[in-house]
Swiss-Prot record:
It comes from Drosophila melanogaster (Fruit fly). GO terms for cellular component: endoplasmic reticulum membrane. The keyword Manganese does not apply. May be involved in the metabolism of insect hormones and in the breakdown of synthetic insecticides. Heme binds at residues 267, 409. Its EC number is 1.14.-.-. Its cofactor is heme. Keywords: Endoplasmic reticulum, Heme, Iron, Membrane, Metal-binding, Microsome, Monooxygenase, Oxidoreductase. It is a peripheral membrane protein. It is an enzyme of class 1 (oxidoreductase). Disulfide bonds: none annotated. The keyword Heme applies. This is Cytochrome P450 4d8.
Length: 463
């Protein structure tokens, strides 16, 4: 209980490190009648995350239930299996190739908007990146522009931002995670949360209905004509895949589709924003890494800003891959993942021997801590992209920024391509300067920084 009283978003990392030094990478904690296992142990993590049996997420995620319903993040059992199977083809190379066009266009807008900030003064880069990530995920998930980067941000984009912040705050408080206690102690915030969720869900449903109608019109036109413009020129979106899918012989309902689209909107903007903001901050503090990265960008993409960047171009940015890997190692966007055991978990261990963790137990895997273990990563608190060069492979389950196993992040390829595009465009255009305060990590649903993501930017002389 003492541990839980000491834990909050700001102290989580510090207290976690103290406990690891004192008790090792495996700890058992009782909170009243709840058994919690805190694991930074690669052997145990591998067995749990690889398991096809222990797939139920930790109950803390239920905070997101009112918004995301039974979407891929929160569902389990048959529903999760069916939805995962439907959504996996969305990340096939040919569809990702189309998504890269969106990354290209929206990152150009981001670069243009950053020009106002690139005056050598300190600013927090988070909002600019967040707006771009929202525009990207809306256009790729829903096939709809929401103009989050435009001056007049849409009510939908604002609702996503405000609701994410509110849910993140609730996530780190044991009593606020209980919907009834939250409602009783903060009725005004419960009302606000409901309003925000209604705004988002009404918008999503409207888009789904419009897209469903367009798809039906398109199919009837295709039967009458072989007009090229009807089909092949239209970019696929996740929504199209969902609209054309069936479960047990029936199409998905609007509500089922909405749950998946909302899940992608939440997971696809917040995590990427965190990853990119931390990466830009580290680049601003490491001019030698930035210079090496710029050299590669110019070599692969050239200096013609009007030339579209393709998925193949992004594949050639090998040093940038090392930079992204190192940033994800130090700052995994999802710093902790958890499971609630529905059945006994039998494990084997080279040090602790074989054993059983009983059904009903909760297991928390601290990805942030796993990535900072000096026995795997010497000088773990230093930003050294070169440690990932020359195909040097880290043992599986010792580097898991996208989690691992059957419930790993389905959009990891998407996220990496988006990060590459944004970083390439920003670093080619602007020098990142080491200004303002350093980041101070806060552990939440998504990793954040207490001090924001402060840096300076200066337009490069055209190279």
């Amino acid at each position: 209980m003492q541990l839980m009283l000491r834990l909050n978003p700001k102290t989580f990392i510090k207290v976690g490190r103290e406990y690891v030094l004192k008790f090792g990478h495996l700890q058992r904690v009782w909170i009243f009648n709840r058994l919690l296992i805190m694991s930074g142990d690669a052997e145990l993590n591998e067995q749990l995350l690889s398991s096809q049996e222990h797939l139920v997420k930790h109950p803390v995620y239920k905070v997101l239930g009112q918004w995301l319903g039974n979407g891929l993040l929160l569902s389990d059992g048959k529903v999760w299996h069916q939805r995962r199977k439907i959504i996996t083809p969305t990340f096939h190379f040919s569809i990702l190739e189309q998504f890269v066009e969106v990354f290209d266009q929206q990152s150009n807008i981001c670069v243009q908007r950053l020009a106002q900030k690139a005056n050598g003064n300190t600013f927090d880069v988070y909002r600019s990146i967040c707006a771009a990530a929202l525009d990207i995920i809306a256009e790729t998930a829903m096939g709809t522009k929401i103009y989050a980067q435009a001056n007049e941000s849409t009510p939908y984009a604002e609702a996503v931002n405000e609701c994410t912040a509110l849910l993140s705050w609730r996530f780190m408080s044991v009593y606020l995670q209980v919907e009834l206690l939250f409602t009783l102690t903060h009725p005004h915030l419960k009302w606000r949360q409901t309003q925000l969720i209604r705004t988002m869900q009404e918008f999503t449903i409207k888009v789904i209905e419009k897209r469903r109608q367009a798809l039906e019109d398109q199919q009837s036109k295709l039967m009458d004509t072989a007009d090229e413009d009807v089909g092949s020129k239209r970019r696929m979106a996740l929504l199209d895949v969902l609209l054309m899918s069936t479960v047990d012989g029936r199409p998905l309902t609007n509500d089922e589709i909405r749950e998946e689209v909302d899940t992608f909107m939440f997971e696809g903007h917040d995590t990427t924003t965190s990853a990119l903001s931390f990466c830009l901050h580290e680049l601003s503090r490491h001019p030698e890494v930035q210079a090496k990265m710029l050299e590669e960008i110019v070599q692969v993409l050239g200096t013609d800003r009007s030339r579209p960047v393709s998925i193949r171009d992004l594949g050639e940015l090998k040093y940038m891959e090392c930079v992204i890997k190192e940033s994800l190692r130090m700052y995994p966007p999802v710093p902790i993942v958890g499971r609630k055991l529905q059945t006994d978990f039998k494990y084997t261990h080279s040090v602790h021997g074989d054993g059983v963790i009983p059904a009903g137990s909760e297991i928390i895997i601290g990805i942030f801590g796993v990535h900072r273990q000096p026995e795997t990563f010497p000088n773990p608190d230093e930003f050294i992209p070169e440690r990932h060069e020359n195909g040097s492979r880290v043992a599986p389950f010792k580097m898991i920024p996208f989690s691992a196993g059957p419930r790993n992040c389905i959009g990891q390829k998407f996220a990496q391509l988006e990060m590459k595009m944004m970083l390439a465009k920003i670093v080619r255009e602007y020098e990142l300067l080491p200004m303002g305060q350093r980041v101070e990590c806060i552990v939440n649903i998504v990793l954040r920084s207490e001090t924001g993501f402060q840096l300076g930017m200066r337009k490069r002389k055209h190279n």
